[in-house]
Amino acid sequence: VDTQEPQFDGEKVILPQATHEAQKAYAASGMLSAAQDYDIGGMQLPYTVEAAANSFFAMASVSIGSGMLTTGNANLLMVHGTDLQKQVFALNEFSGRFSGTMCLSEPQAGSSLSDVATRAVPDGEGFESDALGPRYRLKGNKMWISAGEHELTENIIHLVLAKIPGPDGKMVPGTRGISLFIVPKKLVDTDGQLTGERNDVALAGLNHKCGWRGTTNTLLNFGEGKYPVRGEAGAVGYLVGQPGKGLHCMFH
């Protein structure tokens, strides 16, 4: 797949057919949930064995490694998510129906996460009582996001670091103010079914790579208004864990 660079046609990312087939084969192998318990479809493999098994896939193509992002995303939710977040998001990632990303860096904030500028504000009255978690609207940009946009799975579940402004409307400085949010590409209901509404997450561009092109590397815009939700700009996100504890969750 390294000979066929991903293309963006303005609406969706086009990847080689081989990448689609590899993604399906990897999910069918059960490796996405290999280290999980039997009762959620796992094999209960030790992490060392899981890592060794993944080396065989890496030998075929490192590009299939994007599946490990999905596993990491779901593993985080199994520890820090609510029961419904686990059911709706994590289990669908383990099955391969959904895929996952981790959105930390921004154009102006690579490894310096204290400079994160993506904002998250409460989404109207009753935002705290949403069944999927306290509901916020996110606005900002995330850079160098692997597998951030594609058509390989039914949905993409972004885990996004953002700051909730204080009562004075200002961002809390440093990493203390960073929270973690689930931001699905396509909105879902409490049964994990797609509602038919696209979330306000848009691909701004693909980063060109020297190799490993089977996995896209992206710049994503959250909340720019390209896909308004209920007539408003702002990507809908659900809080994971406690406000201000985003790095603690993300570095699980």
Predicted regions and their residues:
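Amphipathic, small/basic residue-rich leader segments at the start of a protein or domain
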Residues: 1-67, 84, 88
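Active-site-adjacent bridging/hinge elements
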Residues: 20-30, 47, 134-138, 231-251
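Short, solvent-exposed loop/turn segments at the edges of secondary structure
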Residues: 68-72, 97, 113-115, 131, ...
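Internal maturation/activation junctions in enzymes
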Residues: 2-3, 50, 69-70, 81-128, ...
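A short core secondary-structure module
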Residues: 134-194, 198
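A glycine-rich, basic-preceded beta-loop-alpha segment at the flavin cofactor/substrate interface
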Residues: 144, 187-204, 209, 216-252
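Glycine- and acidic
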Residues: 3-8, 32-39, 54-60, 69-75, ...
